[in-house]
């Protein structure tokens, strides 16, 4: 089945994924592709339910001679087009307008005046001036600007320093804005994008999870047939939902391999086995490889070295178990859409690696198995929605993100069994208190009010006093952040009473720790994880 779809061409903006998420929130399927695709690719999309095209922003300058150009077919297909920031400038330049370098750059909050009545902005305003002008609170991020309209266009929005902050050719359904409607700082942005895809593009909103489950199950059955499938189950959201979906489609043809590297959270192995093996009847091979991983990590203090060791050992253990399943023809992975986008970005040189990612991407070549990725079209929030639809426990589906190397990157320096045991218990206390403490204003638990929370083990000792005696024990740091997209994050303002309870419990219940600190660093400049 071809869903109605919106094609998003990415020119390197850091927030392009947010465009796709906003479109999907409007009930419309969207796909992101690099902005340098050719005309043939764009025309081919027309036969696959294409209803409109969105051109993303970019850190590059449309004014530069070597800047990427929008494929000409975009403006020839007869479908509505929305240009955002760089996308607006490229649209203007290629359709006969003028783009100029601006001495006055706009970065951050701005107030934009809407002009005339266009289908995109009509009736949308955050406030009205005494003169009766509708004003929009938006987020700008540009240096260049459009200084002359292409033929057939009219001004749709303006600011004092950017007279053409939006333009429209409503005969051809071409719209463009200099600001970013995809970010939350643009108050009416979600409404603008929903209006573009639903009213201007005429999409019917045929993208929903119940239909997706039925389609995905049918697709897996057709793809796999009677073959057997193996999947590396980590207990994380992505692999868990992938396992549940594949099991729903092919039942006992699926075998999961659960590798316990000794760096999981408290009782995580038991919970995974109970949920999948006991409650859902999934075939699982449970491998306790704690000694193997700890042995290889001994003496290693460098974060990147630890990540690579854990990734390599996981591949080795998984490979050994998979080799015993002679009839398996497919390797399933919990790859999700952001992974696909980031991989494409890396291939085109648009992505920069901050940390190596722990996954099983190298396995298909070594095992000679075909790859099955049933979640590769979904964003994380959609994966969670799918998990609930498949009957997974909400506590598992809405669990905070957990790194593939596990506690290995939450123990600073060398990983030791003693450190992992102390950290596991301290982390469990922190999470328990977050879940049980309700914020009176929102009525939600502080676990639900934070995007990610965990404890970090610091391999340093501090002096303390317990009873009449002096102690010299380890330090634990607590980290809790709030974020919308994990690209930026603020430290969570946890109540002092909550922090006091967590500190008291850890110091009293976890022998070996006598000091607890709270991390108040935002991202950037800090990252969310410490390593």
UniProtKB/Swiss-Prot annotation:
GO CC terms: cytosol
Q: Which residues bind ATP?
A: 234-240
Reaction(s) catalyzed by this protein?
XMP + L-glutamine + ATP + H2O = GMP + L-glutamate + AMP + diphosphate + 2 H(+)
Where are the active-site residues found? Answer: 85, 180, 182
What keywords sit in the KW lines? ATP-binding, Glutamine amidotransferase, GMP biosynthesis, Ligase, Nucleotide-binding, Purine biosynthesis
InterPro entries with a match to the protein in the record: Class_I_gatase-like, GATASE, GMP_synth_C, GMP_synth_GATase, GMP_synthase, GMPS_ATP_PPase_dom, NAD/GMP_synthase, Rossmann-like_a/b/a_fold
Highest taxon in the source lineage: Bacteria
Which residue numbers delimit the GMPS ATP-PPase domain? Answer: 207-399
Q: Which GO terms describe its molecular function?
A: ATP binding; GMP synthase activity
Matches recorded under Pfam families: GATase, GMP_synt_C, NAD_synthase
Which stretches make up the Glutamine amidotransferase type-1 domain?
Answer: 5-206
Q: In which pathway does it act?
A: Purine metabolism; GMP biosynthesis; GMP from XMP (L-Gln route): step 1/1
PANTHER family on file: GMP SYNTHASE [GLUTAMINE-HYDROLYZING], GMP SYNTHASE-RELATED
NCBIfam families attached to this UniProt entry: guaA_Cterm, guaA_Nterm, PRK00074.1
Role according to the record: Catalyzes the synthesis of GMP from XMP.
What's this protein's name? Answer: GMP synthase [glutamine-hydrolyzing]
């Amino acid at each position: 089945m071809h869903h109605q779809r919106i094609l998003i061409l990415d020119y390197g903006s850091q927030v392009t994924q947010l465009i796709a998420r906003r479109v999907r929130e409007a009930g419309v399927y969207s796909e992101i592709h690099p902005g340098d695709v050719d005309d043939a690719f764009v025309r081919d999309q027309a036969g696959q339910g294409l209803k409109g095209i969105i051109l993303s922003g970019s850190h590059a300058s449309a004014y530069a001679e070597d800047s990427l150009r929008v494929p000409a077919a975009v403006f020839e297909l007869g479908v509505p087009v929305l240009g955002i920031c760089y996308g607006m400038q490229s649209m203007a330049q290629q359709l006969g307008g003028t783009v100029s370098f601006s001495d006055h750059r706009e970065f951050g909050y701005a107030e934009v005046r809407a002009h005339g009545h266009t289908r995109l902005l009509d009736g949308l305003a955050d406030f009205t001036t005494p003169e009766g002008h509708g004003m929009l609170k938006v987020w700008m991020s540009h240096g260049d600007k459009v200084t002359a309209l292409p033929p057939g266009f009219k001004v749709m929005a303006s600011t004092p320093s950017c007279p053409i902050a939006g333009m429209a050719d409503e005969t051809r359904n071409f719209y463009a804005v200099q600001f970013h409607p995809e970010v939350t700082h643009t108050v009416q942005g979600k409404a603008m994008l929903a209006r573009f895809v639903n009213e201007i593009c005429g999409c019917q909103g045929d993208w929903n999870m119940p239909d997706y489950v039925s389609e995905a199950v049918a697709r897996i059955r057709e793809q796999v047939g009677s073959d057997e499938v193996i999947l590396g189950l980590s207990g994380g959201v992505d692999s868990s939902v992938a396992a549940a979906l594949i099991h729903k489609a092919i039942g006992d043809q699926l075998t999961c391999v659960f590798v316990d590297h000794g760096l999981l959270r408290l009782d995580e192995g038991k919970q995974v086995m109970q949920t999948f093996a006991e409650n859902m009847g999934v075939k699982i091979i449970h491998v306790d490889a704690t000694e193997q991983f700890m042995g290889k990590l001994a003496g290693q203090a460098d974060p990147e070295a630890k990540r690579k060791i854990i990734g390599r050992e996981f591949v080795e253990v998984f490979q050994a178990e998979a080799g015993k399943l002679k009839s398996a023809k497919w390797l399933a992975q919990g790859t999700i859409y952001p992974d696909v986008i980031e991989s494409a970005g890396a291939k085109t040189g648009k992505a920069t690696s901050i940390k190596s990612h722990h996954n099983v991407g190298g396995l298909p070549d070594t095992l000679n198995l075909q790859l099955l990725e049933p979640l590769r079209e979904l964003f994380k929030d959609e994966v969670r929605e799918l998990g609930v639809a498949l009957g997974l426990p909400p506590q598992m589906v809405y669990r905070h993100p957990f790194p593939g190397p596990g506690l290995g990157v939450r123990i600073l320096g060398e990983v030791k069994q003693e450190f992992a045991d102390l950290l596991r218990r301290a982390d469990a206390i922190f999470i328990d208190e977050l879940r049980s403490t309700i914020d009176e204003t929102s009525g939600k638990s502080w676990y639900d009010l934070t995007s990610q929370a965990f404890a970090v083990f610091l391999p340093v000792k501090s002096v303390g006093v317990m009873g009449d005696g002096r102690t010299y024990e380890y330090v634990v740091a607590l980290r809790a952040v709030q974020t919308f997209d994990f690209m930026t994050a603020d430290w969570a303002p946890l109540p002092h009473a909550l922090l006091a309870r967590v500190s008291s419990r850890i110091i009293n219940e976890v022998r070996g720790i006598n000091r607890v600190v709270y991390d108040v660093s935002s991202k950037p400049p800090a990252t969310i994880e410490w390593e």
